[in-house]
């Protein structure tokens, strides 16, 4: 009988204060150039892989089992020593410390979902202007960065990142005009009308991989692709591009992203069509409408673009 096991701890809420600031290379499609990382927050998962813990499954032998509560404490304690500016670097640091501390762990996977805290805007003294507070922050509940880092041991005992996958999740964008969906296949089952100019509301997750995974991990972030910049590039394309479908839209975003960041080798999309249902239209101005949330089910669109 063959076995494949894993175990770990999920959604370990971790908030590190006064981490290393992030500074990234500016791009035309985004105002984002970095963040101070006064609060660097994430929900972190650790998943341990390998056969070292098989005895716990087959015979209840727990002598090698690192309790998942211990894993939670480990993540919190070791995060104090992390000195990098990126989520990917944080996950790699914690994963490497796990493998260094517990030699019987063969390999593992770390994943994280950013918990963004945005500096509150406060009056700038008597100048009449505004500034970012250095002590007050608003918890963001919208789109956020994500990352997955897989770590393994080499034959000579070195600990390496075998996979790094970065992302921006839970984007929700609506464009009130400048999108269409027409000339699609029609048959006896089709009831959807063609729309040459329609609102388009999409929920979107974007992921990407680097040709060199260490770009996302090393403290030097000059070639790092910030998830905020990816979100802004997607919004810039959506704003100016007349799309003929969601498929058309995500393909254009992907092409633009790969052209902007040659250090990326792949970009992927998972999109949902969440266009509102129309309730009422004004008799005097057809632009004035009332909508409501759509009923399920929702259309899903996926795309992966990889360089040759």
Identify the function of each model-found stretch:
Residues 1-308:
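N-terminal intrinsically disordered, cationic/polar leader segments
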